[in-house]
Amino acid sequence: MSFTDQVKHEVSRLESNNKMCQLAELSALIMMNGSIQIINKNLAVKVRLYHGDLARKVYKLIKERFELNIEIMVRRRNHFSTYQNIYDLFLPPQPGIEVFLKKVGVLDEDHNLLFRIKKELVTSKSCQKSYVRGAFLGGGSVNNPRGEYHLEFRCEHESFAEDLLMLLKRFGLEGHLTEHRKKYVVYFKSFSEVATILNIIGAHKALLKLEDNKVLKEVKNGVNRRVNCETANLDKTVKAAMLQLEDIELIEKTRGLETLSNSLQEIAIIRKKYPYASLKELGKLLDPPLSKSGVNHRLRRIKSIANEIRGER
């Protein structure tokens, strides 16, 4: 089950006791997934849904609030090599259907189609949340939290998408609107925005999963940064050691290590014996032990002698 399906499965089971909020959620679902049909000059409505829990919820809301007749058709389709149920809820022409369409904001009082959010449905904060939940259930999707953060709403009409974006901005969100494949997409791409929307729609289990994955990402990124830093330091240490060994080899071949002072002879012999040791490790091998800066000072003196030899040749 995809993360989107998990979220929709979770929030499909949420029910509001507020009748206006129920209407707000139903309105958003129909605006996202509904279509108007005309049969013998009479209006009919079809709502296409892809989750059984959601189909039952919409059926129950319409039945309880409007007492309309609803026909349910279920069929299966092959979707990306998996079979998926499609639930078509069909409201045939009948008395009360125009009242229903006006209540959910599909028709205005003059029987014109509306492609905007009905303001009366989103006056309270709780109804605004219900509307966003309905919009997500109808046309929302969210990326797996292990990947990049992305949550979107795919809308049929630009004016409705603009209204939805403005509604989401009331929650302090800054989304974006774009057109893609004849749909108008309202989308968000940051952790905080995705987390806020999951909280708005009541997907608290999904929100916990999102937060858990964020922690894992941060730990993984921290480990990677540390490994990269340690690798870079190791490369630097090895490169410096190779140059030091070249200096020591040059002195040994031309003048002999015995020409060096005792302290320089000691560090030259230790470096040859432990070519990949760090300066700190070399210092601990000396007798008596020497600080990192002391080791570095001796190796710089060896480099100066080697450079003198190079200048003579």
UniProtKB/Swiss-Prot annotation:
- Name the InterPro entries on file: Homing_endonucl (IPR027434), Intein_endonuc_central (IPR004042), Sporu_reg_WhiA_N_dom (IPR018478), Sporulation_regulator_WhiA (IPR003802), Sporulation_regulator_WhiA_C (IPR023054), WhiA_LAGLIDADG_dom (IPR039518)
State the DNA-binding region(s): 278-311
Keywords tagged on the record: Cell cycle, Cell division, DNA-binding
Instruction: Tell me one GO biological process term.
Output: regulation of sporulation
- A GO molecular-function annotation: endonuclease activity
Q: Which domain of life is it from?
A: Bacteria
Relate the protein's function as given in its record: Involved in cell division and chromosome segregation.
Q: Which NCBIfam families does the record cross-reference, listed alphabetically?
A: DNA_bind_WhiA (TIGR00647)
Per the similarity annotation, which family is this?
Answer: Belongs to the WhiA family.
For this protein, the record's HAMAP family field holds: HTH_type_WhiA
Q: What is this protein called?
A: Probable cell division protein WhiA
Q: Which gene encodes it?
A: whiA
